[in-house]
Amino acid sequence: MNAKNLHTLGIDIGSTTVKIAILNDENEVLFSDYERHFANIQETLSDLLGRALYKLGPIQVSPVITGSGGLTLAKHLGVPFVQEVIAVSTALQDYAPQTDVAIELGGEDAKIIYFEGGNVEQRMNGVCAGGTGSFIDQMASLLQTDASGLNEYAKNYKALYSIAARCGVFAKTDIQPLINDGAAKEDLAASIFQAVVNQTISGLACGKPIRGHVAFLGGPLHFLSELREAFIRTLKLDDEHIIAPNHSHLFAAIGSALNSKRDTPMELRDMQNRLENK
């Protein structure tokens, strides 16, 4: 078929969300969306494909899957899989080739990717979800709000407290007495974000400098402006060195679409049927 009629579909299956991006032959994003999957990955992906079908009609796509929960599904559907670090690197190469370091926070993982002279080094957190999106959700519930509520509080902070972000249990031990003592929610919210920054920098960079052009990727850094500001403040970045793309929460999905070899075309509807019949 005509390559111009074949779109690429990137699917990112994360620990808490599913993201999709459909690109045209000029690698422009025609459709993108994301949804929390609550462990119902196939159902969630089917819903997202349904939305794409509603908007774009019965198009042909060449899909590629990435993400921590993507390999099993890729095998299941007979669709190519690409490692997330490769997907993200490809998207950055396309959007912001000047990137020196990328900081990516997900629902249950955190990564720092260094780009040095053609080499790519990825550092990732271990089994604990401290300092990630789910940690932020957990801390927000202590303040009887959600992540976006935490973000609103943090906009008006006046003081920062020391909170351990390496573990939700330790953080709770730090926060509860402050709540009991009447600490302002604004200050606690900003302190939680600062704890995430400290955990990411000390736990992942481990002394290796984060400098040059820094890209902020992943849902928490996309949706939570004050978390992003806490990183910028701590790393002392000026505007010229901050890379915060409009689609930063979809970068792995976009990057996986960019990795498509365009050799596995299928109808969106067929893909949806495969998900619903397995």
Spans of features found by a protein language model:
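Glycine-rich phosphate-binding/hydrolytic loop that grips phosphoryl groups
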Residues: I136-D137, I243-N277
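Glycine-rich phosphate-binding loop plus the immediately following alpha-helix
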Residues: I41, G117-A159, L258-R262
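Adenine-nucleotide phosphate-binding core of ATP-dependent small-molecule kinases
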Residues: A171-C206, H249
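Short glycine-rich, Thr/Ser-proximal phosphate-binding strand/loop in the N-terminal lobe
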Residues: N5-E43, D47, E121-Q122, G126
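Short beta-strand-loop/turn "lid" adjacent to the catalytic site in phosphate-handling enzymes
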Residues: D25-N27, Y34-H37, A52-I86, Y114-Q122
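Glycine-rich phosphate-binding loops at beta-strand->alpha-helix junctions
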Residues: G69, C206-T234, P245-H249
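Conserved phosphate-binding/catalytic loops in two-lobed NTP-binding clefts
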Residues: F81-V85, F231-I254
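Phosphate/pyrophosphate-binding loops at sites that engage ATP/ADP/AMP, CoA/4′-phosphopantetheine
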Residues: L48-V61, T200-G212
